[in-house]
C-alpha cells in the first residue's frame, strides 16, 4: 500500500545487492533501480507535504513524530524513514518531539539529544503544529483524538501509513494529509 518507504536491515540491502550483482554481470535491473529510487523519494514525502501545508514556513514549528522504527514491533531503525524526516526537520529549524513504543533508546543512540523524547504519544503531540504518523504501531490506531487535538497547537495530521479515515479525522477538526490519495 502507499506509504513513506521501507527500511530495515534486509530488504534495502538485498535490493542494492541484486542491482550490483546484475551490473557486474552486464545487466540492468531497471525495475529494482526504480524501486530503490522511488523508496528514497517516499521517505521525504511527508516533509514535502508539511512544507506545502505551511507554505515552506517551518522554522520554529514543533513537529511530533509517532513511530521511529522501520516497522512496528521492533526497535530497529536501520534505514528508517523517521531518520530522514528528523534530519530534514531539524535542518530547517523545527523543534521535533518523538515517540515510539520500542525505539526510543535506539533513536537517542543515533541522533542524540537534538529532539524531545516524549513519554507517550500524547506527550509527543503537546504543543505540536503538526503530527506525523511514521510507523503504524497498534497503539497509534485508536488514540483519543479529542485529547490529541486539545494538546496540539494546530490540529494537522500527516498519515504516512494511511491507517486513518480521512473523513473521520476531518470531522474531528483535523487537517488531514495522507499518501497517494
Model-derived segments and spans:
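Structural/interface elements that position substrates and couple domains in central-metabolism enzymes
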Residues: 1-181
Amino acid at each position: 500500500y502507499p506509504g513513506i518507504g521501507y527500511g530495515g536491515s534486509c530488504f534495502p540491502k538485498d535490493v542494492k545487492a541484486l542491482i550490483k550483482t546484475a551490473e557486474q554481470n552486464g545487466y540492468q535491473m531497471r525495475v529494482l533501480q526504480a524501486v530503490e529510487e522511488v523508496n528514497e523519494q517516499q521517505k521525504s514525502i511527508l516533509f514535502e507535504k508539511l512544507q506545502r501545508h505551511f507554505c515552506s514556513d517551518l522554522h520554529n514549528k514543533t513537529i511530533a513524530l509517532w513511530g521511529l522504527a522501520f516497522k512496528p514491533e521492533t526497535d530497529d531503525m536501520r534505514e528508517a524513514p523517521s531518520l530522514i524526516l528528523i534530519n530534514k526537520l531539524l535542518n530547517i529549524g523545527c523543534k521535533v518531539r518523538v515517540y515510539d513504543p520500542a525505539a526510543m533508546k535506539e533513536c537517542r543512540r543515533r541522533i542524540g539529544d537534538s529532539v524531545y523524547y516524549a513519554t507517550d504519544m500524547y506527550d509527543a503531540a503537546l504543543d505540536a503544529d503538526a503530527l506525523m504518523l511514521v510507523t503504524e504501531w497498534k497503539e497509534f490506531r485508536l488514540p483519543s483524538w479529542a485529547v490529541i487535538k486539545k494538546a496540539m497547537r494546530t490540529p494537522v495530521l500527516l498519515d504516512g501509513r494511511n491507517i486513518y479515515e480521512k473523513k473521520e479525522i476531518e470531522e474531528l477538526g483535523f487537517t488531514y494529509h495522507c499518501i497517494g490519495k
